[in-house]
């Protein structure tokens, strides 16, 4: 097995000049940014809610953009553990321009005396939360995988080989959550949150929205798929990559992923990249086809329940992490495996 080390230290982050009137109260609230598309919540946002619950505070949801009033009502009834849902209805926020969202969040955090703001460590979260932290003059705590207490969190470093415990004395905690490290918050329809309209300062956008090209795909989303088939450099080119992996993925109902080398070589789209600089995933089954197992790639798959590797090099590092390994020619093994499924 891959040997890892765990190192813990406490870091007191610089206190902010921003003050909130909380005195010595023990009660506190955690505002969670809830991303949505097509009227549905992002699964990653439900994981952020679960992480927020573990602080011990009251968890509020924050919905912004087009149809946010309607979505908030739906969220309030469906997500079990929210106490309040705050919404800001404004179609101009539909495209999640970070400066706008951060400004709206800033005003609502101040109004509601929020002590923690959580979001998924997603494209939206990575754009909005650093800006929000700068506005409050506090340190952001990024990509957490554990909650120790209301002011202490665990996050990975060194490509996931070291887990660092970080403690902050900042009056407001700005936190992004690694979705694969937390289960989704229950959404069984037993929610009883109140819904309130938030403040809309209508900030001017510093960027202009031009266009969006959404690639429609019948496959499960790579970030949340239960099964993933991924390929690496030995697949040679884009045509071979698709010819070998697609039939297997179809049989398994799996998402398709790729290593950074495969993406850089043009075998697969950048959206399929898995690893430290790509997507962090935690499927029930991960099949690595022709992947050696660079440490940066392993950082993206280490939370998978079962890792199966196919590689002709018996000394490939991937076999130190894999639960199941097949040493052999992938061009023979994968078609045979696909045929037998």
From Swiss-Prot:
Keywords: Electron transport, FAD, Flavoprotein, Mitochondrion, Transit peptide, Transport. The keyword Flavoprotein applies. GO terms for molecular function: electron transfer activity; flavin adenine dinucleotide binding. Coiled coil: none annotated. GO terms for biological process: fatty acid beta-oxidation using acyl-CoA dehydrogenase. GO terms for cellular component: mitochondrial matrix; mitochondrion. FAD binds at residues 285-313. Gene3D superfamilies: HUPs, TPP-binding domain. Binds 1 FAD per dimer. Signal peptide: none annotated. It is found in: Mitochondrion matrix. Disulfide bonds: none annotated. InterPro entries: DHS-like_NAD/FAD-binding_dom, ETF_a/b_N, ETF_a/FixB, ETF_alpha_N, ETF_asu_C, ETF_asu_C_CS, Rossmann-like_a/b/a_fold. Its cofactor is FAD. Heterodimer of an alpha and a beta subunit. Belongs to the ETF alpha-subunit/FixB family. The electron transfer flavoprotein serves as a specific electron acceptor for several dehydrogenases, including five acyl-CoA dehydrogenases, glutaryl-CoA and sarcosine dehydrogenase. It transfers the electrons to the main mitochondrial respiratory chain via ETF-ubiquinone oxidoreductase (ETF dehydrogenase). This is Probable electron transfer flavoprotein subunit alpha, mitochondrial. It comes from Schizosaccharomyces pombe (strain 972 / ATCC 24843) (Fission yeast). The lineage of its organism: Eukaryota, Fungi, Dikarya, Ascomycota, Taphrinomycotina.
